[in-house]
Amino acid sequence: MAVTIGKVVGTLLLIGIITTVILICFAARYIQTVIIPQAHVEANFVMDQTSIIYYEDPNTGEYVEHLSLHGDENRILVDYEDIPEDMINATVAIEDRTFWEHHGVNWRRTLYGVILMFTGQDIQGGSTITQQFIKSFTGYDDVTVKRKIQEIFTALDFEKNYSKAQILEWYLNYIYLGDGCNGVATAAEHYFGKDLSELSLAECASIISITNNPTIYGPNSNVRMTNEDGEVTTGRERNKQRQELVLWTMWDQGIITEEEYQAAVAEELVFTTEVDEKEPDTIYNWYDEQLITDVMNDLMEQYGYSSLVASDMVYSGGLRIYACVDQNVQSIVESVYSDRSNLDLTSNSGQEIQSAIVIVDPEGNIVGLAGALGDKTTNRGWNYASRSRRQPGSSIKPLSVYAPALEAGLITPASVFDDYPVQVLGGSAWPLNNPQTYRGLVTVADALRVSSNPAAVRVLQMLGFENSFNFMQDNFHIDLEEGLEVNGEIKNDLGSSQLALGGLTNGVRVIDMATAYSVFPRDGLYIESRTYTQVTRIAEDGTEEVILDNTNQEPEAVLSSETTYYINDMLKDVVTGGNGATGTAAQISGMTVAGKTGSTNSNTDRWFVGYTPYYTAAVWVGYDTPERIYASGNPAVTMWEKVMSQVHEGLENKDFTQPDGLVTVQICRDSGLRASEACLNDPRGSRVQSMTLFADDVPAETCAMHVSVEVCTASPVLDSSGTAIEGLYHLAGEFCPREADESLGITEGTVQTIGILDYTRELVGGVSSPDGNYFKSFLDAQGTCDVHTTAPEPVEPAGYDPNSFDITDPSTWPPVNDPRYENFDPENPATWPTPEPEETPGAEIPDTGETTTPDTTPAPSPTPAETPGSEPFIPASQ
């Protein structure tokens, strides 16, 4: 039995050892491949040199100094030699007593932290000053096993490269000490109104006391806490308690004497109550501020710096920043956007309207931007151009629907979709248009021009949600939501409302829309937009060292030349097309302009993203807290035109690239196929449209949707109100006259051949569409002509009065079908009608009752003699 138990224990022990070895091997491999490569942190920089922004002079091509940077944050940097010894000693005593001996890690305290972790307790604590600085320096302060392991190896690597004095100097310059203070020199001035070198031992201990928890131990903390005795304590009382602990620790470690300790404890701490509320010396314009932000973000991403370190590098690290700004463009942007009268709108709740603009050139340079409307009065205010994410509405359609569908070969500009509700949603027809009308069958080109929502949804359904989603992210690099839980509901951007109508879960930034649309005038190439080309600094050997480089941005081909041509051609029509086009107010005299408007269902966000061969600009308009915008027209188009018309002054007009292989073809607007004669005879007018397509996209078939039918123009079709429907008549019956027939009294034919649509639409929610009246099924239902219901009977010719004859007036000549004058010849007077004599009333004879016989015979009247030389009148030849 004992032997058996021994074998079991031995086996378990062996398994445990093997498992441990395996885990150690895995851990070693993980540390070697994952942790160590990320362990190095570069911190060799100076913080006492002015950084300068340069811009390129377009006339010379040389970079010109634009701006020297000065930080406006509450911050004073000091060298190690200027830090009081009491401050250094107090810091080491309370934070890391073995600082001068260890190599970055206190293994005893680290092991204690591991034990706490395995017992399910908080694993915080145990960090050395080196480790604390690395957390402050990098901004990585999440408490996880991986982060702790990485912190350990980073600290070991850090102490191999930097001295203890450097580490302590950086630590004391970067620690947060409450009230917006970073660093001990800043805290000295803020809390005591003194230079750091003037602090007493007691004041040094007071400042270092804050590091443990600024919210609790900050002298100005307004947090009120109850101590173990049930007493409510203030921030200053807690700071005093912590200060005395620091002083006691220094005495306990033999750093200060008993006398120094007692004197410091007894010293009254006199805090200043003054608050520095002065305005910053320099208010940066929107472009400079965005540039500073971009450089800071790239420093943090590329070097792992915290935001605090990155900020110090930008403002006082001696950087040379080469900006992409076009000073002329930026000055125009500022002049328009600083003047609120250019867009004077106020919401029902009293909010002033806001707007932002970003302008990008063909090289991907952001040449101008404004982050808000009105005078800029502060630094680091809210920037609507790069920080706000708002729903783009219909401005998303070229990116999410039409470009990917064209690229997939699913549609051409001539393809036809129904501008008619797709379904009933919530008891109403969906989707609605703005305005809330439907047009029926439309080409893709027309759908984009008038911003048809149903057509966009139908194209998206053909394309597929995932294909659209992936195309937006992969080709246009716009972040979409894959899945976000909101109040127990999972929301994402895989749907018609999001991708076809622009109701994105998280919205989109103005800068992202400008970047995405710049692909179109750039012949399908995506280039990430940038505010700078390079950031450099002067190295110790005097050379200019590049630390951030944006010069080698490789263009990414994301659209074919065919797709970009089609999009450009259709979006030009949005601006110049008329007849429902939504962007006509963006026209610039003498310049090619294309673009797309956007508005949300509730009209809380308005967009226009437009471009020329020179620049692409995205404009958003809305309120800080979304409210309905009441304005005539689209205010985003208004702001776009106000800026871009000035930007393009003096520039020569040119068009976008036109590839080879294009042909012009006559297309039916209702079927998208080659036009037939029936398409010309549509009662609404010709439905034939001339379109330019690539040869491979020209339809081979002729329109079969239009069918020819005969109607009678004497019998108009009436609507429900009794009004004649324009151009629509009942089908011709057998008795409707095809031509004039005077023998039947018919002066002209009333039968006409028209082209009608042989198309069936399933009604949704009882919604009608104007083109539905011109469907064959509708006309068939109206029946045949209700005027000519019986065969016409012959009509006798009207009598001719020869007394009306006037040889000089052809209208008085005898009718050709009058047999009495069948020989009539205008040149032969013998054939002319002879006026019938009028009866002369006789004298009235009295009635005497007697009959009398005349006694004489009346003499004959003399015949008038013929006048010599007279001839009969012969009219001129007709």
Give the role of each language-model region.
Residues A323-T346, I357-I359, L369-G371, D375-S388, ...:
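A penicillin-recognizing enzyme superfamily signal
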Residues W100-R109, N182-A185, T257-Q262, L406-L425, ...:
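Short, well-structured active-site flanking segments
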Residues G126-C324, S331, D479, E485-N487, ...:
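Non-catalytic, structured segments within soluble enzyme domains
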Residues M1-E56, F118:
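N-terminal type II signal-anchor transmembrane helix
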Residues V593-Q878:
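Soluble, non-transmembrane domains of envelope/secretory-pathway proteins that act on or interact
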Residues Q49-E65, I83, L199, S349-T378, ...:
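A short, well-structured edge-of-sheet supersecondary motif
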Residues L116-V143, N212, E277-D281, L410-S468, ...:
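Conserved catalytic neighborhood of penicillin-recognizing serine enzymes
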Residues A90-V92, D96, L245, M250, ...:
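Active-site SXXK
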